[in-house]
Protein backbone atom coordinates (compact mmCIF):
# COMPACT_ATOMS: atom_id res chain seq x y z
CA UNK A 1 0.00 0.00 0.00
CA UNK A 2 1.20 3.59 -0.45
CA UNK A 3 2.73 4.02 3.00
CA UNK A 4 4.03 0.45 3.29
CA UNK A 5 4.61 -1.20 -0.06
CA UNK A 6 5.58 -4.50 1.58
CA UNK A 7 2.26 -4.96 3.40
CA UNK A 8 -0.24 -6.79 1.20
CA UNK A 9 -3.75 -5.60 1.95
CA UNK A 10 -5.45 -7.55 -0.82
CA UNK A 11 -4.82 -9.31 -4.08
CA UNK A 12 -6.90 -9.01 -7.23
CA UNK A 13 -7.18 -10.47 -10.69
CA UNK A 14 -6.03 -8.10 -13.42
CA UNK A 15 -8.68 -7.92 -16.10
CA UNK A 16 -7.57 -8.64 -19.63
CA UNK A 17 -9.23 -8.29 -23.00
CA UNK A 18 -11.67 -11.14 -22.26
CA UNK A 19 -12.87 -9.61 -18.98
CA UNK A 20 -13.21 -6.16 -20.55
CA UNK A 21 -15.40 -7.60 -23.30
CA UNK A 22 -17.47 -9.47 -20.71
CA UNK A 23 -17.98 -6.19 -18.80
CA UNK A 24 -19.05 -4.37 -21.96
CA UNK A 25 -21.44 -7.20 -22.86
CA UNK A 26 -22.92 -7.16 -19.34
CA UNK A 27 -23.37 -3.39 -19.50
CA UNK A 28 -25.13 -3.54 -22.84
CA UNK A 29 -27.34 -6.41 -21.66
CA UNK A 30 -28.42 -4.37 -18.58
CA UNK A 31 -28.84 -1.13 -20.53
CA UNK A 32 -32.43 -1.41 -21.78
CA UNK A 33 -34.02 -2.52 -18.53
CA UNK A 34 -32.03 -0.06 -16.38
CA UNK A 35 -32.57 2.92 -18.68
CA UNK A 36 -36.32 2.26 -18.81
CA UNK A 37 -36.65 1.88 -15.05
CA UNK A 38 -38.48 4.89 -13.57
CA UNK A 39 -35.95 7.41 -12.30
CA UNK A 40 -37.38 7.25 -8.77
CA UNK A 41 -36.49 3.56 -8.60
CA UNK A 42 -32.94 4.30 -9.75
CA UNK A 43 -32.82 7.09 -7.16
CA UNK A 44 -33.89 4.69 -4.43
CA UNK A 45 -30.81 2.54 -5.12
CA UNK A 46 -28.57 5.62 -4.82
CA UNK A 47 -30.21 6.62 -1.55
CA UNK A 48 -29.81 3.08 -0.18
CA UNK A 49 -26.09 3.24 -1.01
CA UNK A 50 -25.88 6.57 0.85
CA UNK A 51 -27.71 5.10 3.83
CA UNK A 52 -25.47 2.02 3.99
CA UNK A 53 -22.35 4.19 3.78
CA UNK A 54 -23.59 6.58 6.45
CA UNK A 55 -24.36 3.77 8.90
CA UNK A 56 -23.41 0.12 8.49
CA UNK A 57 -20.26 0.56 6.36
CA UNK A 58 -18.92 4.01 7.30
CA UNK A 59 -16.00 2.77 9.41
CA UNK A 60 -15.07 -0.04 7.05
CA UNK A 61 -14.93 2.42 4.16
CA UNK A 62 -12.80 4.80 6.22
CA UNK A 63 -10.41 2.01 7.17
CA UNK A 64 -10.15 0.87 3.56
CA UNK A 65 -9.29 4.40 2.40
CA UNK A 66 -6.79 4.88 5.25
CA UNK A 67 -4.98 1.63 4.52
CA UNK A 68 -5.17 1.70 0.75
CA UNK A 69 -4.56 5.38 0.09
CA UNK A 70 -2.47 6.24 3.15
CA UNK A 71 -4.90 8.86 4.44
CA UNK A 72 -5.35 9.81 8.07
CA UNK A 73 -8.80 9.39 9.71
CA UNK A 74 -9.81 13.00 9.04
CA UNK A 75 -8.81 12.83 5.36
CA UNK A 76 -10.52 9.46 4.91
CA UNK A 77 -13.77 10.67 6.50
CA UNK A 78 -13.89 13.76 4.27
CA UNK A 79 -12.97 11.88 1.08
CA UNK A 80 -15.02 8.78 1.40
CA UNK A 81 -18.19 8.80 3.49
CA UNK A 82 -18.87 12.54 3.75
CA UNK A 83 -18.30 13.57 0.16
CA UNK A 84 -19.59 10.32 -1.31
CA UNK A 85 -22.85 10.43 0.64
CA UNK A 86 -23.29 14.07 -0.39
CA UNK A 87 -22.68 13.18 -4.05
CA UNK A 88 -25.30 10.43 -3.94
CA UNK A 89 -27.92 12.57 -2.20
CA UNK A 90 -27.23 15.64 -4.35
CA UNK A 91 -27.44 13.55 -7.52
CA UNK A 92 -30.87 12.25 -6.60
CA UNK A 93 -32.07 15.72 -5.58
CA UNK A 94 -30.86 17.35 -8.79
CA UNK A 95 -32.21 14.49 -10.90
CA UNK A 96 -35.63 15.16 -9.40
CA UNK A 97 -35.32 18.79 -10.47
CA UNK A 98 -34.15 17.86 -13.98
CA UNK A 99 -37.08 15.50 -14.47
CA UNK A 100 -39.59 17.96 -12.97
CA UNK A 101 -38.47 20.95 -15.05
CA UNK A 102 -40.80 21.04 -18.03
CA UNK A 103 -41.41 23.69 -20.69
CA UNK A 104 -44.46 25.93 -20.56
CA UNK A 105 -47.58 24.56 -22.27
CA UNK A 106 -50.55 26.51 -23.64
CA UNK A 107 -54.09 25.28 -23.03
CA UNK A 108 -54.73 22.26 -25.23
CA UNK A 109 -51.03 21.85 -26.12
CA UNK A 110 -48.59 19.69 -24.20
CA UNK A 111 -44.91 20.51 -24.40
CA UNK A 112 -42.80 17.91 -22.64
CA UNK A 113 -39.09 17.30 -22.25
CA UNK A 114 -38.05 13.64 -22.21
CA UNK A 115 -34.65 12.51 -21.02
CA UNK A 116 -33.01 9.28 -22.10
CA UNK A 117 -29.81 7.46 -21.32
CA UNK A 118 -26.86 7.24 -23.67
CA UNK A 119 -27.08 4.53 -26.31
CA UNK A 120 -23.84 2.88 -25.19
CA UNK A 121 -22.04 2.83 -21.87
CA UNK A 122 -19.93 5.19 -19.77
CA UNK A 123 -16.29 4.19 -19.32
CA UNK A 124 -14.98 5.51 -16.03
CA UNK A 125 -11.26 5.55 -15.38
CA UNK A 126 -11.17 6.62 -11.76
CA UNK A 127 -8.50 8.43 -9.71
CA UNK A 128 -6.05 7.00 -7.23
CA UNK A 129 -6.76 9.50 -4.49
CA UNK A 130 -10.52 10.17 -4.26
CA UNK A 131 -12.82 7.28 -3.48
CA UNK A 132 -15.84 9.59 -3.54
CA UNK A 133 -15.11 10.69 -7.10
CA UNK A 134 -14.55 7.07 -8.14
CA UNK A 135 -18.08 6.32 -7.01
CA UNK A 136 -19.57 9.48 -8.47
CA UNK A 137 -18.10 8.86 -11.93
CA UNK A 138 -20.20 5.68 -12.02
CA UNK A 139 -23.26 6.41 -9.92
CA UNK A 140 -24.17 9.85 -11.32
CA UNK A 141 -24.48 8.43 -14.86
CA UNK A 142 -26.31 5.39 -13.44
CA UNK A 143 -28.77 7.74 -11.71
CA UNK A 144 -29.70 9.09 -15.14
CA UNK A 145 -30.22 5.60 -16.60
CA UNK A 146 -26.76 4.87 -17.98
CA UNK A 147 -24.59 1.80 -17.50
CA UNK A 148 -20.86 1.89 -16.80
CA UNK A 149 -17.63 -0.03 -17.21
CA UNK A 150 -15.38 0.97 -14.30
CA UNK A 151 -11.59 0.69 -14.34
CA UNK A 152 -10.33 1.74 -10.89
CA UNK A 153 -6.84 2.99 -10.15
CA UNK A 154 -4.57 0.15 -9.03
CA UNK A 155 -3.81 2.03 -5.80
CA UNK A 156 -7.49 2.46 -4.92
CA UNK A 157 -8.78 -1.00 -5.75
CA UNK A 158 -9.47 -1.99 -2.15
CA UNK A 159 -11.84 0.90 -1.36
CA UNK A 160 -13.34 0.85 -4.85
CA UNK A 161 -14.06 -2.89 -4.67
CA UNK A 162 -15.66 -2.35 -1.28
CA UNK A 163 -17.91 0.32 -2.84
CA UNK A 164 -18.90 -2.09 -5.60
CA UNK A 165 -20.01 -4.58 -2.94
CA UNK A 166 -22.10 -1.86 -1.25
CA UNK A 167 -23.68 -0.91 -4.60
CA UNK A 168 -24.74 -4.54 -5.04
CA UNK A 169 -26.11 -4.80 -1.49
CA UNK A 170 -28.13 -1.63 -2.09
CA UNK A 171 -29.83 -3.28 -5.06
CA UNK A 172 -27.85 -2.11 -8.08
CA UNK A 173 -28.66 -4.73 -10.73
CA UNK A 174 -26.05 -6.87 -12.46
CA UNK A 175 -24.42 -5.15 -15.40
CA UNK A 176 -25.27 -1.56 -14.46
CA UNK A 177 -21.77 -0.88 -13.09
CA UNK A 178 -19.06 -3.35 -14.13
CA UNK A 179 -15.85 -3.36 -12.08
CA UNK A 180 -12.74 -4.31 -14.09
CA UNK A 181 -9.44 -3.84 -12.22
CA UNK A 182 -6.33 -3.98 -14.35
CA UNK A 183 -3.15 -2.26 -15.44
CA UNK A 184 -3.07 1.30 -16.64
List each language-model region with its residue ranges.
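Glycine-rich loop-to-alpha-helix module at the N-terminal edge of alpha/beta enzyme cores
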Residues: 3-99
Amino acid sequence: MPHDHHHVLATYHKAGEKEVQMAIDAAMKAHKEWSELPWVERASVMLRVAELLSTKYRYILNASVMLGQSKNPFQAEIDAPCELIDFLRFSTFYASQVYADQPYSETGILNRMEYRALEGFVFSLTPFNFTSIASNLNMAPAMMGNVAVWKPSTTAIHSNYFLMKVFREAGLPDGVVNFIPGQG
